[in-house]
Design a protein with these regions (language model features):
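Short C-terminal tail/terminal secondary-structure segment
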Residues: 2-3, 150, 228, 239-256
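Residue(s) in the substrate-gating loop at a strand-loop-helix junction
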Residues: 145
Length: 256
């Protein structure tokens, strides 16, 4: 059974892979045997994660990328293929949020969140899908959220973007299934990262904590199993799904 989850001989690209959830997934895929390129906008952080991947005995490439730029993503694809060969697994993990009352949100704030969380994901997939279609196989994995299922207070743009991630995942899954490509997403509950650590220390964090049946926040490494599963042969017939990893929060059916 262990062989079903072995990623040896495969190449993964994690866009948004230098911080938070993306970083944990990049390192986890490397632990599972894959060669991994973890990319982001800041070259110093790209180099830092690349060194950790290399320390695990895996191959990598050090490439800074901007999900807001199609040319940058196409260049990432070309350099990955040139350095490591065909890309088997792509994780679209770039994401941002901002808590603000909807009537006070600026057009720029709205556009930045939709651009990164939704359009950036589509750009990422669009860069790598043609190669996967040509080979007749591939794994695309996005990052959803509890906001893919329910509304969250004062994060309207984030909620809209993550709801759209769910729709995009399903649409691309049925479009690309005939080409041997699976398209899925992981929907984390409340996980402590640099992005939300200060918020979780306050009253809002305590509310989430009390509404999570396991009575704790998730650790980013607890998302690795979901990513390895979706990237592996074990999930060869799984597509169009959002895999929830949330300590039971969504199942508790309370207003979050």
């Amino acid at each position: 059974m262990g062989a079903c989850f072995d990623l040896a001989g495969r190449t993964a690209v994690v866009v948004g892979g230098t911080t938070g959830i993306g970083r944990a997934l990049a390192l986890g895929l490397a632990d599972a045997g894959a060669d991994v390129v973890a990319t982001g906008r800041r070259k110093a952080m790209v180099d830092e994660v690349a060194a950790l991947i290399e320390s695990k005995g895996r191959r990598t490439a050090r490439i800074a990328t901007d999900v807001g730029d199609t040319a940058s993503l196409n260049a990432l694809r070309d350099e990955c293929v040139s350095s490591l060969g065909a890309v088997d697994i792509v994780v679209a993990a770039a994401g941002i949020t901002k808590r603000v009352a909807s009537v006070e949100m600026t057009d720029l704030e709205w556009d930045q969140i939709i651009e990164t969380n939704l359009t950036g994901m589509m750009r990422t997939y669009r860069a790598f899908a043609p190669g996967m279609i040509a080979r007749g196989q591939g794994r695309l994995i996005g990052i959803g959220s509890l906001a893919s299922f329910v509304g969250l207070m004062e994060v309207a743009a984030y909620t809209a973007s993550k709801s759209a991630v769910a729709g995009l995942t399903r649409a691309l899954a049925i479009e690309w299934a005939p080409h041997g490509i699976t398209v899925n997403a992981i929907a984390p509950g409340v996980f402590e990262t640099d992005l939300n650590r200060e918020i979780l220390k306050g009253p809002r964090g305590q509310e989430f904590l009390m509404r999570t049946p396991m009575r704790r926040f998730g650790r980013t490494e607890e998302l690795v199993g979901a990513a390895v599963y979706l990237a592996s042969d074990a999930a060869s017939f799984v597509t169009g799904q959002l895999l929830v990893v949330d300590g039971g929060l969504l199942a508790s059916a309370v207003n979050v």
